[in-house]
Amino acid sequence: IQSTSMDQGILTEDSMNSFIRTLIQAGIWKNKVPKQTARTKDGTQTTVKKSEAEADATASQDTRLGFQPVVSVDAELLRQQRRFSSPRVLLSENTPLEPPPLYLTEEPVVLNRTSRRKREGKSHRGEYSVCDSESRWVTDKSSAVDIRGHQVTVLGEIRMGPS
């Protein structure tokens, strides 16, 4: 998911599927590489781990054929994938104690003065909320109004695989 599409509030189904597929491939297929059986010259069977390239090729082929692996995304997988952290999204099993702060983002130090002048107005985090404005955490909400005024469904859980 590119940050530009997140900033604009546009999240296509393809980008979400791509993100979920990346999570699955990075967290599950690299940790649990499939084994295949091979025969040695004397006829005995041995198990051999597939290389990462073969596992990725199998995953790519499965995706093209419409095969969706059925997995549960647990907290351990999310803890391992720190590179998917975002200032806008936090994946956690636990309900937060308080809402996230709406503070100014830190401006990086830039050597180019022209770039600095263009960005003099600081941007606020959290100004584009996907949910209705509430002063408390809402856990039982099933629908909301997005930033364009459209009614959207709030997912309570994400199911992966064929329905």
Swiss-Prot record:
Glycans are attached at N112. Belongs to the NGF-beta family. Pfam families: NGF (PF00243), NTF3_N (PF19338). One of its GO terms (biological process) is modulation of chemical synaptic transmission. Residues 4-119 form a propeptide. Its main location: secreted. The lineage of its organism: Eukaryota, Metazoa, Chordata, Craniata, Vertebrata. Residues 1-3 form the signal peptide. Keywords: Cleavage on pair of basic residues, Glycoprotein, Growth factor, Secreted, Signal. GO terms for molecular function: growth factor activity; nerve growth factor receptor binding. It is found in: Secreted. Seems to promote the survival of visceral and proprioceptive sensory neurons. GO terms for cellular component: axon; dendrite; extracellular space; synaptic vesicle. It comes from the Eukaryota. Residues 35-61 are annotated as: Disordered. This is Neurotrophin-3. The gene is NTF3.
